[in-house]
Amino acid sequence: MSGEVPVNRKLHDADVVYLYDGSFEGFLCCVFESFAQHEIPFAVWTPQRETATLYPVKDIPTDAAKARRVFASFRRKLGAETEYLVSRDFLSGREDKELLLIRFLHLAFALGPGTVKREGHPDVAPLYAMKKSLDWEVDKFQGFVRFEEHGGMLGAVIHPKNYILPLLRPHFCGRFPDENFLIYDAVHQAVLL
């Protein structure tokens, strides 16, 4: 354990599942709850992922004020790089992304802005794996989305593992500035217009 800095000793693994609406703001409220209760939940689920469990389920309502407060603390206390990594990794399709992000944030708030550089740490490495997966998939879809014309509009259907439409937007808006186009993400049931 040499070289490891202990994280908040009050922090404990809790036998509870957080249930939230699946939005980024809702996730930030899960982060708020985790810090307020000094706990790492057993799991974090959305209604789409909810399943039978022996653990109690704690409903985490989305509160815009709490979400803003948590998000503002990322840049102020952890730096722009951490803010970017957490925001981007939230788009990951990984089932346990919320729990991984919460674990990382507890570590980062305990150790400070340099935590994001500790890529070999077991609570940091998964974030870089998610980022790598997102980057690879964005690059793949930027090069391989095939559009078909339908009534003067270009349309395409994609099936990504990650929720990458927000990351594809700048590329395709720049590529087709004067075109009407639509990309439908069939996996996440979302549309980029």
Where are these regions (language model features)?
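Sequence-level detector for tyrosine residue identity
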Residues: 18-20, 55, 84, 128, ...
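N-terminal ordered "arm"
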Residues: 2-63
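Internal, well-folded beta-alpha domain core
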Residues: 114-193
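Generic intrinsically disordered, low-complexity segments enriched for polar/acidic and small residues
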Residues: 15-17, 101, 178
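Charged, alpha-helical interface segments at or near domain boundaries
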Residues: 45-140
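Extended aliphatic helical segments
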Residues: 5-7, 16-17, 31, 44, ...
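Short, hydrophobic/amphipathic alpha-helical patches that form generic packing surfaces
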Residues: 26-37, 103-110, 170-174
